[in-house]
Amino acid sequence: MNVSVVTERRTPAYSSLAAGELNGLVARALLTEARLTPKPGLVDIRNSGAHRDMDLAAFERSTTAIAPWMEKFFIMGNNTAALAAENVLVMLRPLGMACENDMLQATNGVNTHRGAIFAFGLLSAAIGRLIARGEPLEQNRICDQVARLSRNIVAHELSAKKAGKLTKSETHFQCYGLSGARGEAESGFRTVRTQALPVFNRVVQEHDDTHLALLQTLLHLMAWNDDTNLVSRGGLEGLYYVQQQAQKLLWQGGVLVEGGIEAMQSLDDELILRNLSPGGSADLLAVTWFLSHFPAGSLYPE
């Protein structure tokens, strides 16, 4: 089956970035991920994946609603750059809640991008801080700022014993040790920097094909990311199933070998039957594409 895809080439690396430009770059990251096809269990051009309450049009409306908020995260990060990073998170939360409200209005109450709002809100604030400090916009510096903004977020929000029923995120952490999006942010997007970006860059360099690079990167994320979206839908069994199937495809060459795209489509069909959607990995894929537009920089920025 042939499917139409968006195969936008990466723009030259950004040495600086205006707040308004940031809105556009985040929107392109979200739309590039949403339109990438085929994505097992996820909304794409081919189908709605394992989701019965959303489709590609909903993701496009959601992107239009939330992208303008990135400028506000940027400005907050820029205006508070003199403060210790860990003291800024509380100031970002109201922006995140308002952004999420606009998303829900655009999608008639469907959560299309909550994880992406969290990730890109932090990234936008981090970029604002770096520009205010006169520091270069580099992948490792941006992610280091995200880690500083998110310091102790797992301990504060997931570890503490509370009265009443645990949230899904608290259950995932306290029962299984899975820290989800908060843990990834607190690590400075370690999974993206150590796994996803190297794969993406290698495939782009060797094949000059952003579409293939994104699909191969998604497979790597599905294979190794402890995606709590999968745990919510299928328990640990669902997570392990997706990881094992993605690893199997990678051992066979992934989408870089003959029949690889068809194998992704078959896995898509299987995950739909099992009601499994690796939404956390999809968010990290969008983050990967976004960060690829900046130079890597030194591994341990000052």
Swiss-Prot record:
Query: Which InterPro entries does this UniProt record tie to the protein?
Result: CitG, TriPribosyl-deP-CoA_syn_CitG
EC no.? 2.4.2.52
Gene3D superfamilies from the UniProt entry: Triphosphoribosyl-dephospho-CoA protein (1.10.4200.10)
Q: Which family does it belong to?
A: Belongs to the CitG/MdcB family.
Named from the GO MF annotations, one term is: ATP binding
GO BP of this protein = prosthetic group biosynthetic process
Which species does the entry assign this protein to?
Salmonella gallinarum (strain 287/91 / NCTC 13346)
UniProt xrefs under NCBIfam families: citrate_citG (TIGR03125)
Asked whether the keyword Transport is assigned, the reply is no
Q: What is this protein called?
A: Probable 2-(5''-triphosphoribosyl)-3'-dephosphocoenzyme-A synthase
Which UniProt keywords are given for this protein, alphabetically ordered? ATP-binding, Nucleotide-binding, Transferase
TM region positions: none
Catalysed reaction(s)?
A: 3'-dephospho-CoA + ATP = 2'-(5''-triphospho-alpha-D-ribosyl)-3'-dephospho-CoA + adenine
Pfam families, from UniProt? CitG
